[in-house]
């Protein structure tokens, strides 16, 4: 048998183009034997059967599953952070309302009095305590109004707009609450201990219930400020993870 010599082969890019098509392809070669007689050989490749498709699907499936597995933890983390944000807001609302109600109901009258004086103390006697009550009432109202935005962050975990708005307003309310609580804490300290240099006498020994209720209100306000700080840190961390 005479050897066959290949004179011409289709270019490689044309072969690969045909390989990528779902239909069968024809690979044509011009060959010639030693006598110079040209012969054309055609090789037909059948269509990819279902078994081949199954193999191709098996090869691509791990990539899709890996991508979904990589996205699911991130989305779950963001949703969990949003739920934790809502929980912190509810706790801050409770602390803010507690501080407001405790200060608003602070009132004590001593059982003894003179012909010209009656010993009575309430929060409106000091402008610091009045400002404290107003600031905590505003903070509590803001936290209630911020609940829908927190719920939006749960439903749409990748929404950056509501989080950015919340982090700005939370920072403002945290600053107001902290300043009001700090000023009231200074007054409470003087009420308990007095100041001999300024000749301010401690009056909490006489108005014990009054001072105790004011102290509880200040503690609740500091708790609300700490929860607001936690909300700011949580929102900032969530925004950083969105990049």
Curated annotation (Swiss-Prot):
InterPro entries: CASP/CASPL, CASP_dom, CASPL
Function recorded in the entry: Regulates membrane-cell wall junctions and localized cell wall deposition. Required for establishment of the Casparian strip membrane domain (CSD) and the subsequent formation of Casparian strips, a cell wall modification of the root endodermis that determines an apoplastic barrier between the intraorganismal apoplasm and the extraorganismal apoplasm and prevents lateral diffusion.
Extracellular side: 101-131, 185-216
Top-level taxonomy: Eukaryota, Viridiplantae, Streptophyta, Embryophyta, Tracheophyta
Family that this chain belongs to: Belongs to the Casparian strip membrane proteins (CASP) family.
Transmembrane intervals: 80-100, 132-152, 164-184, 217-237
One Gene Ontology term of the molecular function aspect: protein homodimerization activity
Pfam families from the UniProt entry: CASP_dom
Membrane topology type: Multi-pass membrane protein
Protein name per UniProt: Casparian strip membrane protein 4
UniProt topological domain (Cytoplasmic) ranges: 1-79, 153-163, 238-243
Oligomer and partners: Homodimer and heterodimers.
Keyword terms: Cell membrane, Cell wall biogenesis/degradation, Glycoprotein, Membrane, Transmembrane, Transmembrane helix
An annotated GO BP: cell wall modification
Tree of life domain: Eukaryota
Cellular component annotations (GO), alphabetically ordered: Casparian strip; plasma membrane
Localization of this protein: Cell membrane
Organism: Populus trichocarpa (Western balsam poplar)
Glycosylation sites noted in the Swiss-Prot or TrEMBL record: 195
């Amino acid at each position: 048998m005479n050897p066959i010599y290949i004179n011409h082969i289709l270019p490689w890019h044309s072969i690969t183009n045909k390989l990528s098509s779902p239909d069968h392809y024809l690979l044509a070669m011009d060959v010639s034997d030693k006598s110079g007689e040209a012969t054309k050989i055609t090789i037909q490749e059948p269509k990819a059967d279902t078994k081949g498709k199954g193999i191709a699907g098996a090869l691509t499936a791990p990539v899709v599953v890996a991508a979904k597995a990589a996205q699911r933890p991130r989305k779950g983390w963001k949703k969990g952070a949003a739920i934790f944000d809502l929980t912190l807001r509810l706790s801050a609302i409770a602390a803010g309302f507690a501080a407001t109600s405790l200060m608003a109901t602070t009132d004590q009258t001593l059982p003894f009095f003179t012909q010209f004086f009656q010993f009575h103390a309430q929060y409106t006697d000091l402008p610091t305590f009045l400002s404290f009550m107003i600031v905590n009432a505003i903070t509590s109202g803001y936290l209630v109004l911020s609940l829908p935005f927190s719920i939006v962050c749960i439903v749409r975990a990748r929404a950056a707009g509501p989080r950015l708005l919340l982090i700005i307003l939370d920072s403002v309310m945290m600053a107001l609450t902290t300043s009001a609580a700090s000023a009231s804490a200074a007054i409470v300290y003087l009420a308990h201990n007095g100041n001999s240099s300024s000749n301010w006498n401690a009056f909490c020994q006489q108005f014990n219930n009054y001072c105790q209720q004011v102290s509880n209100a200040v503690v609740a306000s500091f708790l609300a400020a700490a929860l607001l700080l936690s909300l700011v840190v949580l929102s900032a961390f969530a925004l950083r993870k969105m990049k």
